[in-house]
């Protein structure tokens, strides 16, 4: 199978679907389309997946015609009132040792497992480390090699209901398309430093590229089978 030349982004919001195609080599926007439609029932509480399926099929054909390349995977940006922001602080006794990456990795993993255990109906889209706290002193970024007795982190988790995630996965699987990553539109809107002149798909690409240095970046599930610890090293390195 030949190497893909393009990254595809879809964005579903309350009134439109936006499509964008980016050149993988230079990140240039090669194709962009906005389409107005009504995707929700019941005052934005329930998605009309039957209507989405028809629009999606037409959109995929347009993209493949434009790029002369089959669409096999995409990045998906979604606006939904069902998104949730959960926050948690976790602590460890660092015994006066220097802070290393593994300490932060352990705490993030601990926080993640607690969130998943108590919210089994949710899937995590974004993990943001808001603060690292060393002996009651806050830091926005990991202060490596500083000594402390007490180390804690404040973490925010942006989540979608698992059934919503599964419904979108099912929708795209009918076109034999894998969703590489879900991105929450409400989360994008909270970032003051993101380029407001860009369209939503471009802003979503900035998220994927790591514009928020406090966000833990994970590897797509279908490739690079690495454990959670190893995946977090991509963030803490």
Go through each PLM region and give its residues:
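Nucleotide/phosphate-binding catalytic cleft detector across ATP-hydrolyzing
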Residues: 1-14, 24-30, 35-70, 78-237
């Amino acid at each position: 199978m030949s190497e893909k030349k393009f990254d595809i982004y879809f964005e579903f919001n309350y009134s439109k679907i936006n499509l964008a195609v980016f050149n993988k080599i230079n990140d240039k926007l090669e194709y962009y389309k906005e389409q107005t439609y009504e995707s929700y029932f019941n005052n934005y509480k329930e998605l009309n997946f039957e209507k989405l399926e028809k629009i999606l099929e037409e959109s995929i054909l347009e993209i493949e015609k434009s790029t002369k390349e089959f669409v096999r995977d995409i990045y998906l940006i979604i606006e939904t009132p069902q998104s949730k922001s959960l926050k948690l602080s976790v602590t460890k006794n660092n015994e006066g040792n220097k802070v290393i990456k593994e300490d932060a990795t352990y705490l993030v993993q601990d926080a993640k497992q607690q969130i998943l255990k108590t919210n089994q109906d949710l899937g995590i889209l974004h993990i943001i480390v808001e603060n690292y706290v060393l002996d009651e002193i806050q830091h926005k970024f990991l202060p490596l090699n500083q000594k402390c007795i007490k180390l804690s982190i404040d973490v925010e988790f942006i989540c979608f209901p698992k059934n919503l995630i599964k419904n979108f996965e099912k929708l795209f699987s009918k076109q034999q398309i894998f969703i590489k990553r879900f991105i929450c539109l409400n989360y994008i809107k909270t970032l003051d430093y993101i380029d407001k002149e860009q369209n939503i798909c471009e802003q979503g690409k900035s998220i994927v590229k790591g514009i928020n240095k406090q966000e833990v970046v994970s590897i797509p599930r279908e490739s690079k089978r690495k454990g959670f610890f190893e995946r977090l090293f991509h963030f803490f390195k």
